[in-house]
Amino acid sequence: IHHANHLRPNRDGLKVGGHQASCASLATVMSALYFSVLRPEDRVAVKPHASPVFHAIQYLFGHQTQEKLERFRALGGAQSYPSRTKDVDDVDFSTGSVGLGVAMTLFSSLV
C-alpha cells in the first residue's frame, strides 16, 4: 500500500488502501441486491468496511458525486463508513461501529 500511494506514478490521483477483502466479498451480493432484488421500501445495513462498494453503486444510481468519491476518506469526501448524516448518498443505517448494523436493523424491524 505504501508503494502504491507514495512510490508508483500516480497520474489519476487515486489512493490505495482500506479493506479490499471486505469490498471483494460483498461486491457480488451488493450488485445483485441493488440491481435486481431491492424494492424502494427495503432497507440495507452495509458492512462498514465495504463502503467503497456501496458508494460506487450509489454513484451509478446518481446519488453520489464523483467529487465525493475522489475525496474518499478525506475532509469533504465520502465517508469510510456509511453515515446518514455525513454522506450525500442514500444511507439507510449508519454502520460505523462494527456490529451496530445488526442491532439497528433488528430494532427497526420491530418498530
Segments predicted by a language model, with ranges:
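Cofactor-binding active-site loop characterized by glycine-rich and histidine/acidic residues
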Residues: 2-14, 20-111
